[in-house]
Curated annotation (Swiss-Prot):
Coiled coil: 63-87
Residues with the Phosphoserine modification: 6, 165, 237, 409, 456
Annotated gene: Dact3
Name of the protein in its database record: Dapper homolog 3
Gly residues biased stretches: 566-576
UniProt record, GO biological process: canonical Wnt signaling pathway; epithelial to mesenchymal transition; negative regulation of canonical Wnt signaling pathway; negative regulation of cell growth; negative regulation of epithelial to mesenchymal transition; negative regulation of Wnt signaling pathway
Residue positions, PTM Omega-N-methylarginine: 255
Native organism: Mus musculus (Mouse)
Amino acid sequence: MIRAFSFPVSPERGRLRGWLEGSLAGLCELHWLRERQEYRVQQALRLAQPGMGGAEAEDEEDAEEDEDAAAARRAAAALEEQLEALPGLIWDLGQQLGDLSLESGGLDQESGRSSGFYEDPSSTGGPDSPPSTFCGDSGFSGSGSYGRLGPSDPRGIYASERPKSLGDASPSAPESVGARVAVPRSFSAPYPTAAAGAETCSSAERRARAGPFLTPSPLHAVALRSPRPSGRVPCGSPDGAASRPLDGYISALLRRRRRRGAGQPRTSPGGADGGARRQNGARPRPPEASPPPGGARPAREPSTERAWAAAWEAEVPPEPAPPAAASPPSSPAEGRLVKAQYIPGAPAASRGLPGRAARRRAPPLTRGRSVEQSPPRERPRAAGRRGRLAEPSGRRGSPRARKAARSQSETSLLGRAHAAPPPKYPTAERDEPRPPRPRRGPAPTPTVQACRRWRSTAEIDAPDGRRPRARVPAPRGPAPSPSAPPRRLLYGCAGSDSECSAVGRPVPLGRRMPSGCAPGGYGESESSASEGESPAFSSASSDSDGSGGLVWPQQLVAAAGASPSGPGGAAGGGTPAGPAKVFVKIKASHALKKKILRFRSGSLKVMTTV
């Protein structure tokens, strides 16, 4: 036996099945009522006829009555045949409802409550008593309508077996009825009261008592407890009564099914293509709108939907169902995201985007890549937005996504960043890259240096009237250290993930040379032109020009007696430096230089891992 209704479904689906059953029973009821009304009209017309001869009229009237009774019996037999075939029809409807693939939300309910064909526990009569009846407020249950309207054998249809159609409707044994009276009934079918079971006469006895037509009509009981949410009584023409019980609910159900996911954030650039949605929108999709884990479900309209759609097609404006609502995208381009730079793990240059497009990501540093593998960055288009310097009020710029990669030895330095004392060589930096400039040239004008990330000490001194000494490529020797102004000094070059490691000449402790001087001026490492020209490194200038290195005072501890070495050591006004300071230029990537500048304490042991 096919165990069709033994799986749990949502209450909505059970209610839909109940309303379909009610509509079918209403159709049969209307046909039956029409036959009864025709019979009554013919009776009234015969009574209103002018009198014929006495015996002749009586004989003719008896013959007409026999004729009418035979016609009524034929109509009742045809109706019973239709009612016999009705369970099989509702079985087919249940199968098509299963093909609708409604979302089963009520998995916690009992497995038997999925359909309206259940035995009424109150009908405990003999084997030919109907399972439930249309009397009083009993409402309409699926099995009750058949037991009331059909022949004398009961038709209790259970959750575990197929409803008996016309071919296999056999009289049930008494123990089969008594054994299954406790099967739970549907949510959709209104429960009959105990008074419903008191009437134990079969439909044959009732037909013998009340003539060929039953009174009161079962349609009256359907109207008393209509399960529709609108609560309208199915009245009016037969067509109207057939379609009205369904137009409110089924149209709303189909609209909700077609419109599912319409309020969710769009994450694909296409319009209403209905492709598989990627869950990266502004807000997460609610779990009931997410597609089922069992795979794609075909969004099709079965014959049930087409059969009942004709009634409400004129009222409800048609909404286009998404054609490919559940098909996954055939290529990555179909399901691509709106913001492609949020795909993790792909560098910005490999996706063909400029470096500034990746600025919205904010991982502090990408780890694990060596400096040689980092591709050259291109920043030609962001020049118009880079006019402001960050306020020199102690704010260190937020970490940017365009930092170069660091090696594993650099990663080991991260843990000590927070334990460092206050900075000794503070920086004035900006949040954004700067436009490309020629490799060598005169000292930058204030407009040019406003667009640069780092400013040298010489450039900081320039507004105060101090003329910086030109750098001469001479062998190292002692040099006096004029006082540095109490401003935030710059101690590294931003754009240079440079690989040049020429050992520079000694430089005063608190100062850096102007960037426009001779080959080896520190400003050249800041130009994007030098970064773009050397493809071997991420943004490196060559070793020959000596630019881009990080100047580090290795005799800082020895200078503690001559110049103040506290946090204000670099800004100690007017204090001349003592013996010669040896400065070493370190080959460092941009990320490493940024990290070194965070470690600006007196301890140089940090640098042993470079």
